Curated annotation (Swiss-Prot):
GO terms for cellular component: mitochondrial small ribosomal subunit; ribosome. It comes from Neurospora crassa (strain ATCC 24698 / 74-OR23-1A / CBS 708.71 / DSM 1257 / FGSC 987). The gene is rsm7. This is Small ribosomal subunit protein uS7m. Component of the mitochondrial small ribosomal subunit (mt-SSU). Mature N.crassa 74S mitochondrial ribosomes consist of a small (37S) and a large (54S) subunit. The 37S small subunit contains a 16S ribosomal RNA (16S mt-rRNA) and 32 different proteins. The 54S large subunit contains a 23S rRNA (23S mt-rRNA) and 42 different proteins. The keyword Ribosomal protein applies. Pfam families: Ribosomal_S7. Residues 39-86 are annotated as: Disordered.
């Protein structure tokens, strides 16, 4: 009688066979795997920081791609695969693979060990134009503050933008030889191309060079002694632009709207450059008074008071 076979004996008698998968992998996967595993510079026995330093030293060493292969060369990885061309690893690819290995070890790009900056540092000292408070021209900023009323700076800035736009779109001015502009000014045809320089030339040309100061009681009989004094550039520009605003406010309005005031100021600036504005008369009057009273600079009363000019 044959011996009985139980289920356990039947399972033990089975033989399990497994077929090995074909070793066909992509070239990129083989190169990356061989680089990360068999790289001589990344040994698992060393700490990650030491491995990274060794990789950086090897990348800085010069080598020739013609005579000897570069480090981390993977030409032998695909030697057993028939029909595949040899893989040449450039220095850029080697650096990229080393960065991948550093990321695999947990080293970040912003680590202290990696020198340099991503975008570079600017040269010091920084120019004043890069400051957000001084990004505009000095003359434009000064004239905007003089245009401001009741602390409404945004309205003054809008008016200044309209003034510059009017100067930019206006035709070239016709200069008057009897009232010359400031020395070194650009030609009349170039002024509309740069409205900021247009405004600067108009203000500096009509700005007075001196001011009259009165000293009470020094002229005798309770009369004040008028003495001419030079003034700095900022005060000269402030006086000239205030004269322009006074002339604009005295002229009749041509209509209502928030753009009319800016247009009248721009028209007066063009009139100043062309020599048609009455601001030139104020400048000539101040200079005539200074010429007439220049003898008061040597007055004995001023010398006794200790005033020197």
């Amino acid at each position: 009688m044959p011996a009985r076979l139980g289920l356990s004996a039947a399972f033990r008698s089975l033989s399990i066979r497994t077929n090995q998968l074909p070793q066909q992998q992509s070239i990129a996967a083989a190169v990356q795997a061989r680089t990360l595993i068999t790289d001589s510079t990344t040994s698992s026995r060393l700490p990650p920081r030491v491995q990274i330093q060794q990789q950086q030293q090897q990348r800085t060493q010069p080598y020739s791609t013609e005579t000897t292969p570069p480090p981390n060369s993977n030409n032998g990885d695909l030697a057993g695969i028939e029909g595949q061309p040899p893989v040449e690893v450039t220095p850029e690819n080697a650096a990229a693979l080393s960065q991948l290995s550093e990321i695999a070890y947990g080293v970040k790009a912003a680590d202290v060990a990696i020198e340099g900056h991503k975008y570079g540092l600017p040269t010091l000292p920084l120019p004043s134009e890069l400051h957000h408070k001084y990004r505009y021209s000095e003359v434009v900023n000064h004239a905007t503050k003089l245009l401001m009323k009741d602390g409404k700076l945004s309205k003054a800035q809008r008016d200044m933008a309209m003034i510059l736009n009017y100067l930019r779109s206006s035709p070239p001015p016709k200069l008057n030889p009897s009232r010359p502009l400031i020395p070194g000014h650009p030609p009349a045809s170039h002024l509309p191309l740069n409205p900021v320089e247009y405004l600067t030339v108009a203000i500096d040309s009509v700005a007075p060079l001196i001011k009259m100061r009165g000293y009470k009681g020094l002229a005798g009989g309770g009369r004040s002694l008028e003495v001419p004094q030079p003034i700095p550039a900022r005060q000269r520009r402030s006086t000239a632009f205030k004269w322009i605003l006074d002339v604009v406010n005295k002229k009749p309005s041509k209509g209502s709207g928030r753009t009319m005031f800016a247009h009248r100021v721009a028209e007066e600036i063009v009139a100043v450059v062309e020599g048609r504005s009455s601001v030139w008369d104020k400048r000539m009057l101040i200079h005539k008074l200074g010429t007439a009273n220049r003898a008061n600079l040597n007055s004995p009363a001023l010398q006794l008071k200790g005033k020197r000019f």
